[in-house]
Amino acid sequence: MSIGIFDSGVGGLTVFREIDREFPFADIYYLGDTARVPYGNKSKETIIRYSLECANYLYSFGIDALIVACNTASSYAIEALRESFDIPVIGVIKPGVELAVKTTKNGRIGVIGTQATIKSGSYRTEIEKKGDFTVYQKPCPLFVPLVEEGLIDHKITELTVKEYLDDIVSKGIDTLILGCTHYPLLKDVIKKIYPHLNIIDSSKATALYLKKKNLDLNGTGERKIFITDESPSFEKLKDLVVGSDIHLEKLELSKICTL
């Protein structure tokens, strides 16, 4: 049995890593749409089209579950994906929210993400369904390019984190949802600056959420990672996040656009 995972770039590898740990015998196929990263500044229509194209390619492997390892795509394209494919389609928003509301002690939850994810209000909507919580949101558009360029431990990243987060942290939040799958790669930087925060990694939450589905996902343990454009920074970060054993395979963008 097999799992398909897609994201606009390298961020979804944090989900791949957690799925790999929880389902060591499943076949896992990952598609990073590096030719069109980021999705966070695209229109809703474009995000849906890109998501359907990525999902359709992964579906051609006969996958049994699809993980939308992109918060932007989870915000805008999840319903279109569920209508288009006859397998479980799991986004990263609901699992992260469920963990956050269980974790917070004072009911003040911060959410950071791309412009598109924050604008969609997806996290606020899901959190408010769970009860009386106060939600503070902040778009952090520079985080994705910083991660994609491999500047995880750079001084400029620390300064950018403070510039974005000082305001919502000052509101008294005790829990922060990393509302983009790139952001767990900045978790150590964020924790260093704000050690008191409970940081919710939606990647791990999503893997645990899938585990609760009790799907028969035993296979041969095959692992494949595809990208739609050459990216030295992706390869470097892939080695950091999931190791160097898995070879990258480049797809021509036209191949997924015409399926």
Swiss-Prot record:
Any one GO molecular-function label of the UniProt entry: glutamate racemase activity
Gene3D superfamilies cross-referenced by the UniProt entry: 3.40.50.1860
Enzyme Commission numbers on file: 5.1.1.3
The keyword Repeat is assigned to this record: no
Pathway of action: Cell wall biogenesis; peptidoglycan biosynthesis
Gene Ontology process terms (BP): cell wall organization; peptidoglycan biosynthetic process; regulation of cell shape
Keywords, comma-separated and alphabetical: Cell shape, Cell wall biogenesis/degradation, Isomerase, Peptidoglycan synthesis
Top-rank taxon: Bacteria
Residues at which substrate binds: D7, S8, Y39, G40, N71, T72, T181, H182
Catalytic residues in the record: C70, C180
Catalysed reaction equations from the record: L-glutamate = D-glutamate
Pfam families: Asp_Glu_race (PF01177)
Similarity field: Belongs to the aspartate/glutamate racemases family.
Function: Provides the (R)-glutamate required for cell wall biosynthesis.
Protein name, entry field: Glutamate racemase
